[in-house]
From Swiss-Prot:
Taxon lineage: Eukaryota, Amoebozoa, Evosea, Eumycetozoa, Dictyostelia
Record's protein name: Ras guanine nucleotide exchange factor D
Signal peptide limits: none
Gene Ontology terms: cellular component: plasma membrane
Keywords for the protein's UniProt record, in alphabetical order: GTPase activation, Guanine-nucleotide releasing factor
Domain called N-terminal Ras-GEF: residue spans: 237-362
Swiss-Prot/TrEMBL GO biological process terms: Ras protein signal transduction; response to differentiation-inducing factor 1
Superkingdom as given in the UniProt entry: Eukaryota
Role according to the record: Promotes the exchange of Ras-bound GDP by GTP.
The keyword DNA-binding is annotated on this UniProt entry: no
UniProt xrefs under CDD domains: RasGEF, REM
Residue ranges annotated for the Ras-GEF domain, each copy included: 433-663
Length: 668
């Protein structure tokens, strides 16, 4: 046809090559066809792919190279020769169509097609009409592929680009012979066949799948040249973000490709973004992508816009109290709201929430964190002076905004107005019993744990009381439980009473463990293990065998060796609701903070570090639950909340201890 060279086709699979050389003994090597790609892709495979590409480019002008499909059954001898390494090149091949069909067959026989994991996402991304955003999404998807898949894909994309150019050049050279249709068919056939071999397609999405391949081919030179702006790692079989630029990080919050299976990703960014950016910059990016969404086709515009607004509202709700005091953030938000004069009906809910930032603070808010149970405590709220000043600034920013000053808002934040209990009420903890006392201790500890916002565990905020008041409240209570334990024992002058008291507190620690309150249990064990108590040999000797065994088990549980291994193993295996030992979280968080940089060597945001931080926050939040069903006894609870009033000073413990059991008496 035309000036194209006519090639006589062999119907018997006519790649003969060195197979015709008789008397050659060879050992068949490991197959490359139908074998899953591995990280250590074999040199044989890469050699085969490279030689196939070189050969096909040399024969790109051959009529029917890709438009003629050779049946798989006729390729058997070709594949056997390749597998047996009898074919070292294709110089003796009598039909290039066999090389082309075998090349495509290799990809279609992979257990998992080269683009199978991102096929649906690629198809969806093609529908994005904003060119820059679309190509960024596609590149991000390609980076999520395993390295071996990505490298092989790049080889083929480069081949398709060169093949298309060769066909076009040949078409221009032979335009007088009307070969345009032939060349167009060859290029289209190549795209069609590689699309089928690479992606999971259906008749309904095949055309758009081909378009996805074409877009990747058009971008391949730029993709190869640019530095990688997002990195992934595999967890539980799914690709999750390991590191990224700020732009790619924000794009992934919206996940417009519908294939990003990383349930903790948004939480990670929302809780840790201030390690590498500001609320103003994050809001700026969200607004930027919202404006892009407004330029998309009608089909995508509503869906994408709502996704972006949902992400924005989710982030703002988590940090509502903090953002309410960030005037730069409020200015940025106000500018955005003013730029959307007519809010679509489907977006009213989101914009109504955004407007709440410009209403005066009547009472400190207790916004719910995303897990639904962790509240900001009163110490994080503004002073009345700061609040008044802020409200005045906000009102100046308001334009025709109706402010509903509702003075009837019910405020239940740590109110003690109904507390008529006398702090000096006479409570006999020994008659009440260790189990009931343990319950009331647990109620107190649980309330204190729930009051700690996640922000107090980040940026080492826990190291400064001014930055973590609720955290330090619970630490102080932990120390108070320990001091109370030691003080109560030392307050008993009679040996018999000391033995009873010592037994009681061992039983109290045991009861706390049984209730899941490991924090108080560890505090009590610390009080029992205070050197002023541990030296009371006469007292310890009088303990019953059972009580001594209980104490030994408690010591083993809270043994410091191997980073609290026994304790960690126990809480890992328990399915019960617990109050964990608070002191380990700072230790774990400091290890993450100091052991990982915020940015990688190539200046990407180290998402892996922040994921580790959030995993600890997530664990803490899982404990911040209204866990316990037993009833509160206000007299006992109030007594326990105020036990520090009558305790001995720790500096006096040793002198009291020596008075109770002098060294001479212990040695007699």
């Amino acid at each position: 046809m035309g000036n194209s060279k006519q090639i006589k086709r062999s119907l018997t699979g006519s790649i003969l090559l060195k197979k015709q050389i008789s008397q050659i003994f060879f050992k068949k090597l490991e197959s490359i066809f139908g074998i899953a790609l591995a990280e250590d892709t074999s040199d044989r495979l890469m050699d085969y792919l490279n030689k196939s590409i070189d050969y096909l480019l040399d024969h790109s002008v051959i009529e029917g190279l890709f438009s003629i499909e050779i049946e798989e059954s006729k390729l058997k001898s070709t594949i056997e020769s390749i597998e047996s390494t009898l074919i070292t090149d294709f110089s003796l091949t009598t039909d290039p169509c066999y090389v082309a069909s075998t090349f495509i067959l290799y990809f279609s026989k992979l257990p998992n097609l080269l683009l199978s994991k991102i096929s649906s996402q690629l198809i969806h991304s093609v529908e994005i009409s904003h060119e820059e955003y679309r190509i960024n999404v596609i590149r991000s998807l390609l980076y999520s592929l395993p390295l071996q898949n990505r490298n092989i894909l790049k080889m083929v994309l480069h081949f398709l680009k060169k093949f298309s150019l060769a066909c076009n050049n040949n078409n221009n050279n032979n335009s007088e012979n009307n070969n345009t249709i032939v060349e167009d068919i060859e290029v289209q056939s190549a795209y069609n066949r590689f699309t089928k071999a690479f992606m999971s397609t259906t008749p309904g999405n095949f055309e758009i799948s081909c378009k996805a391949i074409r877009l990747m081919v058009m971008d391949i030179d730029e993709f190869d040249k640019l530095p990688q702006d997002i990195q992934y790692m595999v967890k539980d079989g799914e690709s999750i973000v390991k590191a990224a630029t700020f732009d790619r990080l924000v794009e992934k919050l919206f996940d417009l490709s519908y294939g990003f299976k990383d349930p903790d990703y948004n939480y990670t960014v929302f809780h840790t973004y201030d390690y590498y950016t500001t609320s103003v910059e994050l809001l700026g990016k969200i607004v930027h992508y919202y404006r892009i969404a407004c330029t998309l086709t009608t089909k995508l515009q509503m869906e994408v816009s709502i996704t972006i607004l949902s992400v924005a509202m989710f982030w703002m709700k988590i940090h509502h109290n903090h953002l309410m005091t960030d005037l730069q953030f409020l200015q940025k938000l106000k500018i955005f709201l003013d730029s959307v004069p007519q809010v679509p009906p489907t977006q009213v809910t989101y914009f109504t929430y955004f407007q709440t930032f410009f209403k005066p603070v009547i009472e400190p808010l207790k916004p719910l964190y995303e897990r639904g149970n962790s509240f900001l405590g009163p110490n994080l709220t503004q002073s009345s002076g700061t609040s008044k000043k802020k409200n005045q600034l906000i009102e100046k920013m308001m334009i025709n905004n109706n402010i509903n000053n509702n003075n009837n808002i019910n405020n239940n934040v740590n109110s003690n107005s109904n507390n008529n209990f006398n702090n000096n009420i006479d409570i006999d903890i020994y008659n009440i019993g260790s189990n009931i006392i343990a319950q009331q201790i647990t109620i107190i500890d649980n309330e204190m744990l729930m009051a700690i916002p996640p922000s107090q565990f980040l940026h080492k905020s826990f190291s400064k009381e001014s930055k973590s008041p609720q955290f330090h409240d619970m630490v102080s209570k932990f120390n108070e439980w320990a001091r109370w334990t030691s003080s109560e024992i030392l307050s008993k002058e009679k040996l018999v009473e000391r033995v009873v008291t010592l037994s009681f507190f061992i039983d109290l620690a045991k009861s706390c463990v049984e209730l899941g309150n490991y924090n108080a249990a560890n505090a009590i064990v610390g009080g029992l293990n205070h050197s002023s108590i541990s030296r009371l040999k006469l007292t310890w000797e009088r303990l019953s065998t059972k009580v001594t065994q209980d104490y030994d088990r408690l010591l083993s549980l809270f043994d410091l060796s191997m980073n609290y291994k026994n304790y960690r193993d126990e809480i890992k295996s328990t399915k019960a609701k617990i109050i964990p030992y608070l002191g380990l979280f700072p230790k774990d968080l400091i290890a993450i903070e100091e052991g990982n940089d915020n940015f990688t060597n190539n200046n990407l945001i180290n998402t892996e570090k922040f994921r580790l931080l959030y995993q600890t926050i997530k664990k803490i939040q899982s404990y911040q639950q209204p866990l316990f069903t037993f009833k509160t006894s206000e007299p006992i609870k109030q007594y326990l909340k105020n036990i520090s009033n009558g305790l001995s000073e720790e500096k006096d413990f040793h002198s009291i201890s020596h008075k109770l059991e002098p060294r001479q008496q212990q040695t007699q």
